[in-house]
């Protein structure tokens, strides 16, 4: 290594200068690296969350932002009664929040996403730890609601982020469970996705379109391969196997946690399927013809 630096120094002497000039001409052919926003819940209290997200460990994780659940009454609170956002990683740097993940066939979402952790002490455990093949039926979760002031602060943060990255598509504002359905359940069924949609953040379905598909499907659901294809078209990392296997049930469960939180069993039903196709028609309309056989589209 010492000889390497000596060689570099010699080259600089031979060239006769130690710096160089640049001409900056901004190309029109570029865009932001940020295409996704991933929302998490911490499953820890604030102090534990902050330590987990900022200190080195055997399994290091981080996020760009952390939102507390309430104003902190201690010496570290410099904001009075105002709830602050904690910025932990600069948006132009990669935070380690998504883990093994996929959305719309894009993998390793850490590279192109902003991660937001919302403090919420929910808890999920597998009831059968000895079973290496995880099953939807073996997940036991205790979910908790989110305080109004916490969600109001999240709204302000999201509006601010979207002003900087206006090209982020509504369907690409996702839950951790959306992009890692076999591993994650956060932020959970109490997270107010519809409330965010009502102020222009994220995706949601239209009721008239939902009613149309609810009537189309009736009590006769299409084959499992069509269901897998529809989930995949919208963005969920579900392999098309033609079998109602566990990876499919995890995908359905993640979808239900986001869009039909009243029942997230992982079993596809008429209501969930109508919501899914209402979303596809709204946000993936160019893909709808692929399902003409089951929708009787002429």
Residue ranges and their predicted role:
Residues 217-288:
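Short acidic, glycine/serine/threonine-rich helix-capping segments at coil-helix boundaries
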Residues 26, 51, 102-105, 136-149, ...:
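Second-shell loop/turn segments in exported
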Residues 6-14:
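Bacterial N-terminal signal peptides
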Residues 1-4:
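Positively charged n-region of N-terminal signal peptides that target proteins for export
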Residues 20-167, 171:
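Active-site-adjacent loop/helix surface patches within enzyme catalytic domains
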Residues 161-176, 239-243, 264-267:
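Surface-exposed patches in mature extracellular/periplasmic domains of secreted proteins
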Residues 29, 66, 189-213:
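Acidic, His- and aromatic-enriched active-site or binding-groove loops in soluble protein domains
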């Amino acid at each position: 290594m010492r000889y390497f630096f000596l060689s570099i120094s010699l080259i600089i002497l031979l060239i006769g200068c130690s710096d160089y000039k640049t001409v900056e001409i901004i190309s029109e052919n570029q865009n932001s690296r940020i295409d996704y926003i991933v929302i998490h819940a911490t499953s820890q209290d604030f102090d534990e969350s902050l330590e987990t997200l900022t200190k080195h460990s055997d399994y290091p994780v981080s996020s760009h932002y952390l939102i507390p659940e309430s104003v902190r009454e201690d010496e570290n609170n410099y904001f009075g009664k105002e709830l602050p956002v904690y910025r932990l990683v600069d948006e132009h740097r990669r935070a380690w929040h998504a883990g093994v993940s996929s959305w719309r066939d894009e993998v390793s979402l850490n590279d192109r996403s902003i991660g937001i952790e919302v403090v919420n002490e929910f808890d999920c455990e597998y009831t059968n730890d000895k079973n290496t093949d995880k099953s939807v039926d073996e997940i036991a979760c205790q979910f908790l609601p989110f305080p109004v002031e916490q969600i109001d602060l999240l709204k302000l943060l999201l509006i601010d982020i979207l002003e900087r990255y206006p090209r982020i598509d509504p369907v690409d504002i996702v839950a951790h469970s959306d992009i890692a359905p076999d591993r994650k359940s956060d932020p959970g069924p109490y997270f107010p996705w519809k409330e965010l949609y009502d102020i222009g953040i994220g995706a949601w379905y239209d009721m008239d379109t939902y009613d149309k598909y609810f009537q189309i499907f009736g009590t006769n659901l299409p084959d499992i391969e069509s269901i897998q294809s529809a989930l995949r078209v919208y963005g969920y990392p579900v392999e098309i196997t033609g079998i109602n296997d566990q990876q499919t049930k995890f995908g359905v469960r993640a979808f239900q946690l986001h869009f039909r939180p009243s029942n997230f069993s992982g079993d596809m039903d008429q209501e969930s399927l109508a919501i899914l196709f209402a979303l596809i028609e709204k946000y993936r309309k160019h893909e709808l013809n692929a399902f003409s056989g089951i929708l009787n589209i002429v």
